[in-house]
């Protein structure tokens, strides 16, 4: 059974210089731990993977929350004003309000980075998630996969004009890379820091991912020496991992993690 989209009203955020806004979400009732979907950069909660995972949770009687960040999908906003800090705040707001006890966070691409940042914040509050599924986790992507790889002329355009419109492999329309996006994200970089997440992590990665290369993810995994980490590699998988066989693997991994967490509790 489908779940209707609802809107969560948020007040003016003077710190982020945001007007009052609404975040769109779909919250499926069911058993704990809830599965919470954290989408990727410029993706939304109606994506193939998010929808398939919601359908699997419906079959299992499992609670599932998915939502759109500010200026994504059904959540209104000016993408030029959006930053990683805003999207992290959105995720934390949703998890705190609707996540229930010890949810499982499923983060795709940028959502993987946000899942890690959110976990650190939630642990400090004594309400950590019970596990993470990370799909092609784009940790520190704004700095290492964007800024560090941009030619000098593009960097200068971003610094001078405040924005550069990047051609998209997934859309006919280019999308804005803003100076505020790059500079704000620097306070959230974690790859050069000791990382100890403290909950089980399962990573799903395509070996032929051109956007978040497997070598990049291997580097991230090597920094998680103190954590319980599993990794499933799809040899011919790309970044999206949205083929039926990829979706089946994601659903299986998520179900297995939930089952193992329930057995251990």
What are these regions (language model features)?
Residues 41-54, 215:
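The serine-hydrolase catalytic nucleophile loop
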Residues 54-76:
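Conserved alpha/beta-hydrolase
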Residues 73-98:
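Catalytic nucleophile-loop/oxyanion-hole region of alpha/beta-hydrolase
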Residues 105-107, 135:
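Short beta-strand immediately N-terminal to the catalytic nucleophile in serine-hydrolase-like folds
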């Amino acid at each position: 059974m489908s779940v209707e989209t609802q809107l969560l009203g948020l007040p003016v955020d003077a710190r982020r210089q945001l007007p009052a806004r609404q975040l769109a979400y779909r919250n499926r009732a069911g058993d704990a731990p809830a599965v919470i979907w954290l989408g990727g950069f410029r993706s939304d909660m109606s994506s193939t993977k998010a929808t398939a995972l919601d359908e699997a949770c419906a079959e299992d009687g499992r609670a599932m929350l998915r939502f759109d960040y500010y200026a994504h999908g059904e959540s209104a906003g000016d993408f030029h004003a959006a930053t990683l800090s805003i999207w992290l705040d959105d995720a934390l707001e949703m998890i705190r309000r609707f996540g229930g006890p010890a949810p499982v966070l499923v983060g795709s691409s940028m959502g993987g980075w946000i899942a890690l940042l959110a976990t650190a914040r939630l642990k400090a509050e004594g309400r950590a998630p019970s596990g993470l599924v990370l799909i092609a986790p784009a940790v520190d992507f704004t700095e290492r996969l964007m800024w560090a790889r941009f030619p000098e002329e593009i960097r200068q355009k971003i610094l001078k004009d405040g924005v550069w419109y990047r051609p998209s492999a997934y859309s006919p329309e280019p999308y804005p890379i803003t100076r505020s996006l790059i500079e704000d994200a620097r306070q959230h970089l974690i790859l050069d820091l000791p990382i100890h997440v403290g909950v089980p992590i399962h990573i799903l990665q395509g070996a032929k991912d051109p956007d978040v290369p497997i070598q990049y993810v291997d580097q991230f995994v090597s920094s998680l020496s103190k954590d319980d980490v599993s990794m499933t590699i799809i040899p011919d998988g790309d970044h999206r991992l949205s083929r039926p066989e990829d979706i089946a693997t994601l659903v299986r991994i998520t179900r297995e993690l939930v089952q193992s967490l329930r057995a251990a509790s």
